[in-house]
Amino acid sequence: MEIRPFDQAVHQHRTMSVRSATSSIPMDRSPEAHIETEMAALAAGFVNSTDRHVFLTGKAGTGKTTLLRRVVAGTHKRCVIVAPTGIAALNAGGVTIHSQFLLPFGTFVPERRLPAELVGSGRFHDRYTLDGRHPLNAVRRQVLRDLDLLVIDEVSMLRADVLDAIDHRMRVVRGRAGVPFGGVQLLLIGDLFQLPPVVKDEELQVLQRWYRSLHFFESLGLREAGYAHIELDRIFRQRDEVFVRVLNNLREDRVTADDIAVLNTRHRTQLSEEEREGLITLTTHNRTADELNSAAMRR
């Protein structure tokens, strides 16, 4: 595991954090489990011992979701888990960002008032309309007032303008207008090689006035606050080193002839119905997937 920037607090709390965080984790004597447990303890210790915002990343299979669960289970801080989509929120055991913060669908412009040419379009929102037309209810306001730690999973899909809308919500509700995210610590989890933010051309043309890109790390609030970067670099999901190499090369767009040869050893053009049983079929269209699923349900 690599931590950048290497905050002094990591050195100060590492031994204590590993000792305290592992006590509630089921014992597994394998080397992989020991490494994973140590990483979980270090990440949990960093989150618990500092108020620094953290971006936790890593390739698929490095244990990001496992770490999320262990950090949340072991923290003394009051926390909420959110994610950009319903499926991501369900997998993380949380709720969607728009549900938790009652954000309107559309584009958030990080200004008190919209530029004149955007007024009346109905597709753009500013701080004024967010507060006046889309207020938080009492329950959600109290949750945000009590909050210490906000965990955002699948953060690669999170747009910078949405993160700034979250920032504004928390500054207002918590009465700390001059402090990014109202003083709430962020734990941002995701892989930037996976799904990017979705943005229409019209939205991008407008938002380019404030953002260099729409990735979450261009959020004005996050740039003001800064964050530590923790990268998990040990893959636990796959044990086959050759297959891990192929997956890494695919991820980084540097596939070799040897990689293709490895993949082709698994290529079969004809499979019987019995052999297909239990296999996952990937399709390019929802209609094809629906037909296959319906046929399987009828059997």
Language model region names:
Residues 2-299:
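Conserved ATP-binding/catalytic motifs of P-loop helicase motor domains
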